[in-house]
């Protein structure tokens, strides 16, 4: 599939079109070229995209694949007239739902009159601020309002996972490192003790941890395989002893880690 | 549409199913209850979900809507046997693509053998670390390797946008505040001058800024409407003078802001 182009054409940001399109394209081994055309909401703009699609088809000798999220019937019709394979996510699924619900759709694509004023959106921004302020044990204040506290050795994946939970799910995710001093003392950091129930552990294969730490501080004791082994094993024992559930981040993406954590903590305010 | 439940059933994290499902549900005014069932990858787990769907149908007197991203034919068939309306995103779109490409699909849903080892994933994690280290002008080091530097007054939306760009698009997004001292001096912070070309501005309506700042520091001069007006107007003049493109975050979601910035900066390494 070389010389093949995929277009994402949307009357909004195109995030939905692209996210969905990518999950479908991930089914195929080849990597086509991506072209994003957001905010296509007038016939004029649509005709411009059609010219681009047709030029591409001529140049590549293969018709492009075009993922669309377009509400306006006229705009949609114009794009359909191009020399391409159109995959229309809304048209295919919204109509059966109208029949099922017995109501007409709003003819909107993931857009709200003013998303920035919705409670859900405000909660997400607040969660991001909370997670930033509570990154890497920076603050023990307000841990009582955290939805989850990720714990684990340095560089086990806590920070990106916390931010992802906040950004995608509006979860107030603090994270707190387990460090050699804690292992020597044989006890959880005292700030965590009252909140043990909402702690969730991340662990990681010592070999992978060594690689990650080595990039940060080459040839340090901190990055040595021996030290990584000791820290990981001490952290796993401690989490086991304290009854803290954990998972390994070694072969998992942030999305997979986050989904597993959500399934486990099932915060009351999410129906999960 | 009260007492109506929507299920998201996936053999992976379910992020794709949910993102797509939500963009479709946003077409309707009512808010059904959401239930997420990720990692459904065996017949046993599928039968459990079927029981849940049927129980819900009985209790609510209406068949649930079920968005699925399931590759395994057996698992898919089991879910289809439940009393519900199934909306199958992969089945509907992957098959025509197989015909178009003339190759069989990988039968995978946005998953890779080991995503954590792909270059794309490593770049994303690196971008998150970069964006965190360069949040709020914390560091002027390595600004030359930033893909974009967001500028604007305090609380104009720079931090969440930077993190989103890093997390979703692997963009190294620094952010740097424009503060009263800069306006008094009438010049950009000196660290930004060599990198003006990759600066992108965020602005915000003074009334909205006042609300946001008021939550942080109630009744401060910082949060007063008069001060917000002065800062916003000074920042907009400065960006105009320096030839820095900007947009207003007032009525936009992070996703919309990020998409607009990407369209504008078109980083070379993304085919955008």
From Swiss-Prot, chains A, B:
InterPro entries: Kinase-pyrophosphorylase (IPR005177), PSRP (IPR026530). Its EC number is 2.7.11.33, 2.7.4.28. It catalyses: [pyruvate, water dikinase] + ADP = [pyruvate, water dikinase]-phosphate + AMP + H(+); [pyruvate, water dikinase]-phosphate + phosphate + H(+) = [pyruvate, water dikinase] + diphosphate. ADP binds at residues 152-159. Keywords: Kinase, Nucleotide-binding, Serine/threonine-protein kinase, Transferase. One of its GO terms (molecular function) is ATP binding. The keyword Hydrolase does not apply. HAMAP family: PSRP. Bifunctional serine/threonine kinase and phosphorylase involved in the regulation of the phosphoenolpyruvate synthase (PEPS) by catalyzing its phosphorylation/dephosphorylation. Belongs to the pyruvate, phosphate/water dikinase regulatory protein family. PSRP subfamily. This is Putative phosphoenolpyruvate synthase regulatory protein. It comes from Methylibium petroleiphilum (strain ATCC BAA-1232 / LMG 22953 / PM1).
